[in-house]
Design a protein with these regions (language model features):
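Carbohydrate-interacting regions of secretory-pathway proteins
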Residues: 20-26, 34-38, 44-57, 61-317
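Bacterial Sec-dependent signal peptides at the C-terminal "C-region" and cleavage site
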Residues: 9-31
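Intrinsically disordered, low-complexity peptide-like regions
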Residues: 2, 16-18, 254
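Sec-dependent signal peptide recognition
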Residues: 1-8
């Protein structure tokens, strides 16, 4: 329809005697295919390595756009990625970082990888490297192994705290974090799995279950709210649930999650809210960006009180 309209305008403008109107279209410029795709980033900081994630896409004739996930926070759109030969750069507004400046990224292609420097909103600059994210697609449904109960009756065996202090306790199989503090991480790592978890939170509290330590399924007091990718049962910053199936705060609730490669299905309180959708990359707060490797389960404990019970994981054989 648009092309026909343009042709008609050309005919009218050139006069009836011009029986062969032409349309001028700017030529496409070459796009460096080495940049396009998803990248797992590792940032070198004085406090150790920190994970991030970058997606670069070709838009239109010669533009690059994308998404970025920082050390924490949700996926942010990148309206323009400047590519000049082997180099790239972009700048985006701050989100949850310290400081009020932009987050600015500079980098260059180095063989099959990327490397560069990242300046945070507080003005501090760190070096980073990135490898192409593994696809992890096309996997058949695996044969499942035996279910593993991850909680002991009265101790934290099989788990460790991510911080210097630990506020988590287990009494009679009830795992509790009475206040904001450290996250809790399984000692064991998993690849593909099915997970059953039961949880309870007080009003306005927040937690999350990180699959392989990299992909957060949000736990939050969202009873009565519309769906969003940062709300109850969403994959934080990436995938919105079809509905919010949350119960009122103070009640026990359940997730049944299946993760095969990047494909995730989430059943919240008996209702399927995400059906075999792709998780594009790591979410903010991930332990690392090594997406091709098995990883632990971790429970977010730094956003308010929360209780868990009956955590059962069934790994693929």
């Amino acid at each position: 329809m648009l092309r026909n309209a343009v042709l008609l305008l050309g005919i009218v403008a050139s006069g009836a005697t011009n029986r062969n109107p032409t349309i001028s279209v700017a030529p496409s410029l070459a796009v460096d295919e080495r940049m396009i795709g998803r990248w797992d980033i590792t940032i070198a900081t004085p406090d150790g390595e920190k994970p991030s994630w970058l997606e670069i896409e070709h838009s239109g004739r010669d533009q690059m756009v994308g998404r970025f996930v920082g050390v924490f926070g949700s996926a942010r759109p990148i309206s323009v990625i400047v590519v000049n030969g082997d180099s790239l750069s972009f700048s985006i507004p701050y989100q949850w970082e310290n400081g009020n400046g932009n987050l600015s990224v500079r980098g260059a292609a180095q063989g099959g990888a990327l490397a560069g420097a990242m300046t945070f909103p507080d003005g501090k600059t760190y070096s980073w490297t990135a490898v192409r994210a593994p696809r992890l697609d096309g996997r058949p449904t695996p044969a499942w192994g035996a279910p593993i109960r991850l909680l002991h009756a009265n101790d934290l065996g099989g788990w460790h705290s991510s911080g210097t202090t630990n506020q988590w306790t287990v009494v009679n199989g009830l795992l509790s974090s009475p206040r904001s503090g450290s996250n809790l991480v399984t000692d064991r790592k998993f690849g593909d799995f099915k997970l059953h978890v039961e949880f309870r939170y007080p009003k306005e509290s927040n937690s999350g279950v990180y699959l392989r330590g990299r992909h957060e399924v949000q736990i939050q007091d969202d009873f009565g709210n519309p769906p969003a990718n940062d709300r109850f049962s969403g994959v934080y910053g990436f995938i919105s649930p079809s509905v919010i199936a949350a119960r009122p705060a103070g009640q026990w609730q359940t997730y049944d999650i299946t993760l095969i490669g990047r494909m995730v299905t989430v059943v919240a309180n008996g209702k399927q809210v995400i059906c075999n959708q792709e998780i594009p990359g790591i979410t903010g707060g991930a332990l690392d960006s090594h997406e091709g490797e098995p990883g632990p389960l971790f429970l977010q404990g730094d956003h308010g009180p929360v209780d868990y019970r009956n955590i059962v994981i069934t790994p693929a054989r």
